[in-house]
Curated annotation (Swiss-Prot):
Protein name: Proteasome subunit beta 1
Pfam families with a match to the protein in the record: Proteasome
Swiss-Prot/TrEMBL catalytic activity: Cleavage of peptide bonds with very broad specificity
Cross-referenced InterPro entries: Ntn_hydrolases_N (IPR029055), Pept_T1A_Psome_bsu_arc (IPR019983), Pept_T1A_subB (IPR000243), Proteasome_sua/b (IPR001353), Proteasome_suB-type (IPR023333)
Family statement: Belongs to the peptidase T1B family.
Propeptide, chain numbering: 1-9
Gene for this chain: psmB1
PROSITE patterns to which the protein is assigned, alphabetical: PROTEASOME_BETA_2
Length: 207
């Protein structure tokens, strides 16, 4: 868990549901005690049914995403199908472990849907764990206070979205480095979808 000391200024949440995966993140980027952006994207589509959420240095996250997208396209060209979630997580782990002395500063969530929904968390040294739900970043303790009490393996995607928003919102209320809106992505049998700002605000009002 040593890598968490390097990660400030964001909160991400991932949840495995019966029928898909939810990834959420706030939109604030900070440098020290200063907010430097209020509209940062922290969740990225890698392929039709694959995505990465990152907590940490924005430049490092973007560099990793570019590498994963390139490898994913190459895999499709060679094999003729999309990479599995586990394969993408393993690839991410291998890339990170190969840069231990010049690391990507971040904590990464890989979510996807192939034969079933799955979710992996990967630290910047390449340590990998498969999770049912996970949070990373400066507000993770507040997000976990919600997730630990309310998560169920029987949760549906719709209810998983509500739970993820509730968890991120708890971090926004308590963590000064987390804020400025919530990005929500779902991945199910049909593929990757980002909820609109209006959809998220509507769900927030119902909390």
């Amino acid at each position: 868990m040593w890598a968490l000391d390097k990660i400030k200024g964001t909160t991400t949440v991932g949840i495995v549901c019966k029928d898909g995966v939810v990834l959420t993140a706030d939109r604030r980027a900070s440098l020290g005690n200063m907010v430097i952006s209020k509209g940062v994207t922290k969740i990225f589509q890698v392929d039709d049914h694959l995505a990465l959420a990152g907590a940490g240095a924005v430049g490092d996250i973007l560099s990793l995403v570019r590498a994963l997208r390139a490898e994913s396209k190459l895999y499709r060209a060679k094999v003729g199908k999309e990479m599995s979630t586990k394969a993408l997580a393993t690839l991410t782990s291998n890339i990170l472990s190969g840069r231990k002395y010049l690391p990507y500063f971040g904590w990464f969530l890989i979510g996807g849907y192939d034969e079933k929904p799955s979710l992996y968390s990967i630290d910047m040294a390449g340590g990998i764990t498969e999770d049912k739900y996970v949070s990373a970043g400066s507000g993770m303790e507040f997000a976990y206070s919600i997730l630990d009490n309310e998560y169920s393996e029987k949760i549906t995607l719709n209810n998983g979205v509500k739970l993820a928003i509730k968890a991120i919102n708890a971090a926004i209320k308590r963590d000064v480095f987390t804020g400025d809106g919530i990005m929500v992505v779902t991945i199910d049998r049909e593929g990757y979808r980002e909820l609109s700002k209006e959809e998220v605000e509507k769900l927030l009002k119902k909390l």
